[in-house]
């Protein structure tokens, strides 16, 4: 089994695969008579013309490190954002595409409270909270069409931190 090492999650490192959703620095603007800071437009949401944005809640079972990555998926019709509701960090494994096959895997671990938006058609591992179960708000495409492609890895990867 090949090893995949977790690397630091930064906006720059994750940019080819999506967006880091985090409160970095002061808010972009103050709203509500100055009582609320708005961190504005943090993700590139992208849905085909037949779909719309929807918000779902996911309850995910805890995983541990090292983690065996044996299945990835992608969503050809829309992006998918994961926002932790309880602060549980989660593993984010992503890969480039080569003619329908995931290649050149990378692994990241969110800090408590960080979320990610995964770009449309980007291969990624399933939701994997580390150390405790997690609840997540997920913003993704709702609508007709096949928006899930799964790819079982012929040789699983061992993700280590």
Swiss-Prot record:
It comes from Rhodobacter capsulatus (strain ATCC BAA-309 / NBRC 16581 / SB1003). It catalyses: (S)-ureidoglycolate = urea + glyoxylate. Catalyzes the catabolism of the allantoin degradation intermediate (S)-ureidoglycolate, generating urea and glyoxylate. Involved in the utilization of allantoin as nitrogen source. It comes from the Bacteria. GO terms for molecular function: ureidoglycolate hydrolase activity; ureidoglycolate lyase activity. It is an enzyme of class 4 (lyase). This is Ureidoglycolate lyase. Its EC number is 4.3.2.3. InterPro entries: RmlC_Cupin_sf, UAH_cupin, Ureidogly_lyase, Ureidogly_lyase_bac, Ureidoglycolate_lyase_dom_sf. The keyword Lyase applies. Its cofactor is Ni(2+). Homodimer. Gene3D superfamilies: Ureidoglycolate hydrolase. CDD domains: cupin_UAH (cd20298).
């Amino acid at each position: 089994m090949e090893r995949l090492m977790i690397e630091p999650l930064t906006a720059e490192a994750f940019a080819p695969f999506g967006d880091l959703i985090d409160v970095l620095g002061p808010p972009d603007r103050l709203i509500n008579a100055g009582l609320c800071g708005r961190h504005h437009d943090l993700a590139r949401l992208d849905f085909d013309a037949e779909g719309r944005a929807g918000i779902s809640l996911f309850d995910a079972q805890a995983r541990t490190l090292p983690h065996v990555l044996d299945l990835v998926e992608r969503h050809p019709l829309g992006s998918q954002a994961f926002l932790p509701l309880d602060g549980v960090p989660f593993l984010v494994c992503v890969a480039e595409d080569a003619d329908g096959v995931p290649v050149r895997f990378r692994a990241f671990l969110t800090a408590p409270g960080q979320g990610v938006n995964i770009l449309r058609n980007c291969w990624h591992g399933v939701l994997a909270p580390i150390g405790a179960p997690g609840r997540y708000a997920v913003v993704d495409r709702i609508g007709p069409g096949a928006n899930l492609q799964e790819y079982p890895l012929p040789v699983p990867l061992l993700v280590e931190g």
